[in-house]
Design a protein with these regions (language model features):
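Conserved N-terminal phosphate-binding loop of PLP-dependent enzymes in the Aspartate aminotransferase
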Residues: 1-154
Length: 154
């Protein structure tokens, strides 16, 4: 009953929270004019891709990178790529870094953040490489391989 009443009524929200969106847009445009954001994103993303790719190569692994500098997607070039990604995520969490198969570069990222990430990856990748070579990846993952895709629980 109440939902039907709301459905048929006209409510203007011009002076409610909808002022937040345009205000944020104006602030974003001002920031984009004052800072070369695309250049920063390209630099940070390149440092991330190059650094992680080089570390992986030293361990005999290949990581492929895709996407725009602001949205880097990474995947291990291996038949059990999802399992390797899961192991990498678990071990990086133990180093205090939450990682997934994507890196979303932002203006807030600086060299020190990439340095910290690469320092942790340098500790973790030897085990990931060993697991890939010995084939015991699944034994090293405490709660199973990550789920891919999206599905409703109901």
């Amino acid at each position: 009953k109440f939902m039907e009443a709301a459905q048929s009524s006209f409510i203007s929200s011009s002076y409610w929270t909808e002022g937040v969106g345009p205000t944020a847009a104006v602030a974003t445009l001002a920031k984009l004019k004052s800072v070369n954001v695309p250049s920063h994103l390209a630099s940070i993303s390149d440092r991330f891709r190059t650094g992680l790719g080089d570390l992986a190569k030293t361990q005999g692994l290949t990581i492929r990178f895709y996407g725009h500098p602001a949205i880097t997607v990474l995947t291990f070039d291996h038949p059990q790529a999802s399992a390797l990604q899961t192991l990498f995520t678990v071990r990086m969490l133990e180093e205090g870094i939450l990682v997934s198969s994507g890196f979303y570069a932002s203006l807030s990222h600086h060299e020190k953040h990439i340095d910290r990430f690469l320092e942790a990856a340098d500790k973790v990748l030897p085990e990931v490489s060993q697991a890939a070579k010995t084939g015991d990846i699944l034994k090293r993952i405490p709660n199973g391989v990550k789920h891919t895709g999206f599905s409703r629980l109901t």
